Amino acid sequence: MLFPVIVKKLKTMEVSILIIRQERPEDYDTVYHVVKEAFENAEYTDGNEQNLVAALRKSKSFIPELSLVAVEDEKIVGHILFTKAVVQGVEVLALAPLSVLPDYQNRGIGLSLMKEGHSIAHKLGYEYSVVLGHSKYYSKAGYIPASECGIKAPFEVDDESFMALNLNGSQNKLNGVIEYDKAFGI
């Protein structure tokens, strides 16, 4: 399924179409390089995000419908991956990583990927998405401190950086530590 989004190119003010679609096996090599390049100069990175994506694709937590790419002018410029995680027996989603090529950042592509991913996740019946990242950025997509949803990290982290999003508006508050797929190494 294709999800077109109109994006303005800031430098030229041209308008182009951004397509968000499910990742396909033939995209894997390109996505590997997109993720690697997106994190090369990131403030917080272990330099291994591209290998994490490859490992998660082979895991039980992988959800093909929630591995999405952003395509502009027939070029993959972004990728997002949501995988299964668990909080006290309840399946939730872990958003990691979100990658956009440096030349395409600050144009709303990451937010578009999140919005489409959240929509699909809601349709699939998931209640929460959890992310570790910059609060100023992820709050634009509705993420709040995970502690407000009763979700705790399995590691030391400040409250602002560990966030969650209630995908269906339910009042169900969880109470426990998130368990990530073993591919995360946590």
Over which residues does each language-model region extend?
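N-terminal amphipathic/basic-hydrophobic helices that include classical n-h-c signal peptides
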Residues: 1-16
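C-terminal "cap" of GNAT-fold acetyltransferases
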Residues: 152-186
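A short beta-loop-alpha structural element at the N-terminal edge
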Residues: 19-31
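Conserved acetyl-CoA-binding loop-helix of GNAT-fold acetyltransferases
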Residues: 95, 100, 106-119, 130-131
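Conserved glycine-rich acetyl-CoA-binding loop
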Residues: 75, 101-112, 124, 140-141
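Conserved active-site alpha-helix within GNAT-family acetyltransferase domains
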Residues: 123-127, 132-157
